[in-house]
């Protein structure tokens, strides 16, 4: 879910062209991307793509074709996978599980009643990322020569660390949490493209990549990263999902700019609420996160035969379509001036 910082970020978020990321390393929140693919790449009645053995392949389709498109533009990708979540996140994860279970019941009922539009809508909320699916994604990345990092805890924290120390230019996620973890830059809409349907409306909008620079954000708001984290706690994070009643992003900003720290806010209801959350531990999760100390990422040669064997022979992908994508990628790499010919 992440923190709803959008009202504070809209003024500094800049739309970019993917071509501007050529030769730059982008650390992608793997779970965030895979869940996007699982939610959006589905059949006519909302069912996920599967192979002949019943194994879900929607995430592999999205991972392969979107990565090919990005690599063809000379963008260097690193996927960062979640490890064990902080214990404070268990409540949020349990709530997400219940939402998925309810969505599945509504999906099945809509199917039975022939309400296909509703069925497709509910289906998007049922996505589950199982261990074999994560392993399949890692296998595909290895065959594509794309490095991945296994984080010990939150993947976004390790991705942000890579951005902070300069191994990656930016992190990529739909959530804003990377900024709370200290990422120098966050890119949204990197792994999605085209048009997006607005919730509960028959209206589609263009989806364009955007970049948020942490320094610009903090300067524009005249706050520190520590104060940004306190603002997030007031709004509600994955570690205190309820937040504080009646407190949105703009009111939280006003309170922190006035009082500087949560403990100093002279509002009785907030002080009472602070007694029921471990806000210092939440601060530490963001400001002193457990991360993989990545020093270098290694981009390897692509294994075209291995990709065809894995996707086409083992997971029932179209050999013609996979071959076409690989040929397009190879041609783009040949004419690239970025020195990425080592991928082949």
List each model region and its residues.
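Glycine-enriched alpha-helix->loop->beta-strand junction motifs that scaffold or abut catalytic
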Residues: 167-169
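Non-catalytic nucleic-acid-binding/docking modules located in mid-to-C-terminal regions
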Residues: 3, 12, 16-22, 37, ...
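Noncatalytic, basic helical substrate-engagement surface that gates or grips nucleic-acid strands
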Residues: 3-12, 20-164, 184-186, 192-193
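Active-site-adjacent pocket scaffolds in enzyme catalytic domains
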Residues: 181-184, 248
């Amino acid at each position: 879910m992440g923190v709803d910082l959008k009202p504070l970020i809209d003024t500094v978020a800049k739309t970019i062209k993917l071509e501007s990321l050529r030769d730059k390393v982008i650390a992608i929140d793997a779970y965030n991307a895979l869940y996007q693919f699982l939610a959006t790449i589905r059949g006519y009645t909302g069912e996920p793509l599967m192979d002949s053995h019943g194994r879900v392949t929607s995430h592999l389709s999205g991972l392969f074709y979107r990565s090919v498109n990005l690599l063809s533009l000379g963008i260097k990708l690193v996927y960062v996978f979640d490890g064990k979540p902080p214990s404070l996140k268990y409540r949020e994860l349990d709530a997400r599980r219940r939402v998925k279970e309810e969505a599945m019941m509504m999906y099945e009922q809509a199917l039975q009643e022939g309400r296909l539009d509703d069925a497709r809508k509910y289906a998007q909320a049922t996505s589950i990322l199982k261990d074999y699916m994560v392993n399949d994604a890692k296998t595909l990345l290895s065959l594509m020569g794309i490095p991945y990092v296994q984080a010990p805890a939150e993947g976004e924290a390790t991705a942000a660390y890579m951005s902070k120390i300069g191994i990656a230019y930016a992190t990529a996620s739909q959530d804003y949490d990377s900024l709370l973890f200290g990422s120098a830059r966050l890119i949204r809409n990197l792994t999605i493209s085209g048009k997006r349907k607005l919730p509960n409306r028959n209206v589609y909008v263009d989806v364009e990549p955007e970049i948020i620079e942490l320094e610009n954000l903090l300067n524009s708001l005249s706050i520190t990263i520590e104060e940004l984290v306190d603002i997030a706690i007031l709004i509600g994070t994955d570690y205190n999902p309820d937040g504080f009643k009646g407190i949105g992003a703009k009111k939280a900003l006003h309170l922190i700019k006035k009082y500087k720290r949560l403990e100093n806010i002279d509002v009785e209801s907030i002080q009472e609420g602070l007694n029921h959350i471990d806000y210092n531990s939440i601060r530490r999760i963001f400001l002193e996160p457990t991360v993989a100390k990545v020093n270098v990422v290694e981009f390897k040669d692509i294994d075209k035969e291995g990709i065809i064997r894995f996707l086409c022979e083992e997971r029932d992908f179209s050999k013609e379509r996979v071959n076409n994508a690989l040929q397009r990628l190879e041609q783009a790499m040949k004419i690239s001036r970025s020195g990425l010919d080592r991928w082949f």
